[in-house]
Amino acid sequence: MITPILLIKATVDGMIARRFGRIVNITSSAVKHPIDILGLSNGARTGLTGFVAGLARKTVGHNVTINNLLPGPFDTDRLRSTIAIQAKTSGRTPEEVVRDRHKANPAGRFGDPAEFGELCAFVCSAQAGYITGQNFLIDGGAYPGTL
C-alpha cells in the first residue's frame, strides 16, 4: 500500500500541471471478496482503494484520473504455479484442479491476460476521462455481489 501511494504522490502534481494523467493500480478481486489466508494483503489493497477514492475526486477536474483494476484468476505463470502446488497437496492432477476452478467460475475459464491489458489500455486512454475512482472487477463473474 505504501509504495503505490508514494508513487502516486510523486507523479500526480506533474500530471495536474500538464492537465492530463492516468493512474491505474492493479490490486485484486480480494478487495471485494477477501481471501481468508491473505489477511495483510487484503488490508493493504483495501487501504490503497480507500486512498484512491478520496484523491481521484480531487484530481479529475484537472483531467487526471485514478482507477483500480481488481483481477480474479488470469492464465498467468503465477496462477499455473499455484495450481501445480494445489494439485500436489490435494493429490490431484493440475488438469483436475483447472477443471474444478473453471467450473467454479461463471465464465467457465480463466481470464486471458490480453483482456486485462485491453481494459487497462482503455482506462488509460483520453476517452476514459470521465471515469475516476472506480474499481474494475475483472473476474469472469465470480464475485456474487452487486456493488
Predicted regions and their residues:
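A short, exposed helix-loop element centered on a Lys and neighboring polar residues
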Residues: 8-9, 53
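Catalytic loop of short-chain dehydrogenase/reductase
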Residues: 16, 22-48, 52-61, 73-74
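Short, flexible catalytic-loop segment of classical short-chain dehydrogenase/reductase
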Residues: 32, 71-85
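Short C-terminal tail/terminal secondary-structure segment
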Residues: 33, 121, 132-147
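Short, small/polar-rich loop/turn modules that mediate ligand/substrate recognition or access, typified
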Residues: 60, 65, 131-133
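Conserved SDR Rossmann-fold cofactor-binding beta-strand/turn motif
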Residues: 65-75, 124, 137-139
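A conserved structural motif in NAD(P)-dependent oxidoreductases
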Residues: 93-94, 105-116, 127
